[in-house]
Amino acid sequence: FVNTIRLLINKAREWNNKQSS
C-alpha cells in the first residue's frame, strides 16, 4: 500500500516537473 502511494507521489512529482519546465 505504502509502495503504491510513494509511486503515485513520484509520478505526480515528475509530472509537475515536466509541466513546470
UniProtKB/Swiss-Prot annotation:
PTM annotation (Serine amide): residues: 21
Reported tissue expression: Expressed by the venom gland.
GO molecular function terms attached to this record: toxin activity
Keywords of the record: Amidation, Secreted, Toxin
Record-annotated membrane-spanning stretches: none
GO cellular component: extracellular region
Cell compartments where the protein resides: Secreted
Entry's family note: Belongs to the cationic peptide 04 (cupiennin) family. 09 subfamily.
Protein name per its UniProtKB record: Cupiennin-6a
Organism whose genome encodes this protein: Cupiennius salei (American wandering spider)
Lineage: Eukaryota, Metazoa, Ecdysozoa, Arthropoda, Chelicerata
